Amino acid sequence: RNQVWLYRLGTLEAHVAVNYPFTGFHDTRLCYVGQGWQFQRQTDITPPGENGSTVRHLDMQQPADLLQADMWLSVFDEQGAPQKFPSEDFVKRVSDRLVGRWLQQEQEADTTVVLQVLCVEPGDSMEARDACAGLLAAARQSLSRTLSQSPQPR
């Protein structure tokens, strides 16, 4: 399922989407590649005050429509706990799995929910980037709270 909301602040336009449920990790980038988007840069960021979870930031462009966008992705488990994006490095991914099995660390969430914040044509304005970051923070908090208060299937 997919739920999308559109927010506007002056000339800035942002789409907030919640996609669910996915079994394990869903690579949302594949959906955008299929729509002609290209990724210029990707950064995984640990939000302040959080341990072990990451937010993925993507600089994107769509040459056919001459569009530029910033997208932030955040993944949650069914209980609303933010998750960490898997490593992009194949060797690190394999070693993390082996070490995780050896140490019997917590496994990846079985079911995940993906939050997307897509800011189209944000430009280089710090105000626009701050507005998108604020929208992301509020959306993450709201989704986490909603999921944590939802009845869990037994």
Which residues make up each language-model segment?
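Short, solvent-exposed recognition patches
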Residues: 1-105
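Surface-exposed amphipathic alpha-helical segments
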Residues: 110-154
